[in-house]
Amino acid sequence: MHDENLLQLINDDLAPAEQLLGLLQDESIALKGRDMQVLENILARKQSLIILLEQHGRRRSEILAILGLATNRSGLESLASHSSVGTQLLSQGDVLNQLLAQCQAANLLNGQSIQTQQAITANQLRILHGGEAPSLYDARGTTSMLNKHRAYSQA
């Protein structure tokens, strides 16, 4: 009974995990295009999927814990060894783990992209406000001064 419930939870998480992966890929494209409206929509949808996946993950862990098993792959293997749906449990669990690993990798890349864009924006603002490094040149070809503030039209 617990094994079938666990299998159902795993199967129920496959579609949301695939949707999350698709959203993360869309987010990557939107980040490159700096499309804020699309990013806001993606964020809202991402959050609901993450909440759902976390809830199901906790339920799966609770089922394994109730049975006195480890709440990881070895616990799932122990349950599968005594279950009529054991091979399905392991195979679907592997599929879900692979999807979630892909989601984590895509999310990491998106995070790095955000950090890069933040650094670029901060550098651009520093240049606009006259705080650029002395190795940069002004319109006359002379080395600009570090703390020289100027109007935006002169930047």
Please give the residue ranges for each predicted region:
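Short terminal interaction segments
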Residues: S78-A155
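Extended, charge-rich alpha-helical scaffolding segments
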Residues: H2-S81, S91
